[in-house]
Amino acid sequence: MSHSTFSHLFSPHFGAPVYSPVSSRIGGRYVSSSVPTRSVDFRSRSSAPAPRLSYDKVDFSSAEAINQEFFATRSNEKRELQELNDRFASFIEKVRHLEQQNSKLILELGQYKDQHQGSTGRINELCQQEMRELRRQLELMAKDRDQMQVERDNLAEDVALLNQRLNEEMGKRQEAENNLTLFRKDVDDATLARLELERKIESLMDEIEFLKKMHDEEIQDVQVSVQSQQMKMEVMETSSRPDLTGALRDIRAQYESIATKNMQESEEWYKSKFADLTDSAKRNAEAMRQGKQENNDLRRQIQAQNCDIDSLKRTNEALLRQMREMEEQFAAEARNYQDTVSRLEDEIRNLKEEMSRHLREYQDLLNVKMALDIEIATYRKLLEGEENRIVVPIMKMPSMSGYSGDYGQFSDTRAGQKVVIKTVETRDGEVVKESTKEKGRDEKKDSHGQGKD
């Protein structure tokens, strides 16, 4: 690194040292002093003007002391200026390095934004489209679910009605079974009564046969007795010859009338009993036939009700199975849609976090750039203040009536650069407010110079 070099050039006319413009290369940058824009008379630091020295009254000892003091002051100022230049060069080098990094990061950020802006927009658009599609499907599923719930309620009502009918039919069946049991009992009673009547008929027939036999035996006995009486009468007639024929004839007629009457009474009693038993048997047979017919009708009704109950049970089981399958299907689809929504929300949250991170990095870079710009402006103001403070005196020869000095100003190649202050406010990864403010360095320098004047 080269330092600033002051060359003393003595003019042939005035014999005074003139400081030529100084340039130095600091960290790859050139800092050159501009052409002096004004001349400053060398006077004492007090506000009173310096006395003019004539050639005849020059005190060379005092001039030499003044020159030594001046050169000592200048050497100290040169050392301080050299140190300041070294520090400024290091700061400039650091600023240049940071600006290179800043420009590189800004370029990378721009490339990243160019690369990911479209993709982020497409991802957001795809996410929004998919979310709309999922919401539409959820609405359709909600409508289907409501419809299925209505159908389920209707089926539940139908099942309740069928259960009610089933209970009623089961009650009727139980009543029919009870009636059938009673009818079976009546049939058994009728069968027992019929058997009892048949036994009675048999006993009566046996009794009739016995009575017939007894009647026949009595008739035979009567006939035998009549014959014996006739024989006796004949014997008596033959012996006494009384008129017994009429008496026998009367006795025979009486016995015949008694036998005929007994026969008729027995036949009438038998016929009446037989008719009663026949009517009772017919009534029992009719009741048994009706009981069998009612039993068959009830059996057919029970079979039909059992078939209806079985079909209703199968229909109910099929509907319940279909309802469970649909509920499982809807639950699985809802879980899938919920997983998809969660995944999309995670992706959106990750994208927002990544965007927030990039915005924070960009804001940090802007803050670093602003701090560096402020630091550079501060050093520039310090240098300008140092330049304004330093007054370069020019020694006059004894023939000169006064001292004149030139003041050189350093000019920076970056004096015309503008400072861009960009403020970005973010909230939850989204840009809320963004503002940009431009400020020229020349304006700052001019305002500072006007304040000095």
UniProtKB/Swiss-Prot annotation:
Entry GO MF terms: structural constituent of cytoskeleton
Residue numbers spanned by region Coil 1B: 127-222
Domain of life where this protein originates: Eukaryota
Spans annotated as Linker 1: 113-126
Region Linker 12, residue ranges: 223-245
SMART domains from the UniProt entry: Filament
Residues in IF rod domain copies: 77-390
Keywords noted in UniProt: Coiled coil, Intermediate filament
Region (Tail): 392-453
PROSITE patterns: IF_ROD_1, IF_ROD_2
Gene3D superfamilies: 1.20.5.170, Single helix bin, Vasodilator-stimulated phosphoprotein
Disulfide cysteine pairs (residue numbers): none
Spans annotated as Head: 1-51
SUPFAM superfamilies in UniProt: Intermediate filament protein, coiled coil region
Extent of Basic and acidic residues compositional bias: 424-453
Keyword Coiled coil attributed: yes
Region ranges (Coil 2): 246-391
Cross-referenced PANTHER family: GLIAL FIBRILLARY ACIDIC PROTEIN, PERIPHERIN
Summary of the function given for this chain in its UniProt record: Type III neurofilament.
The name this protein goes by in its record: Plasticin
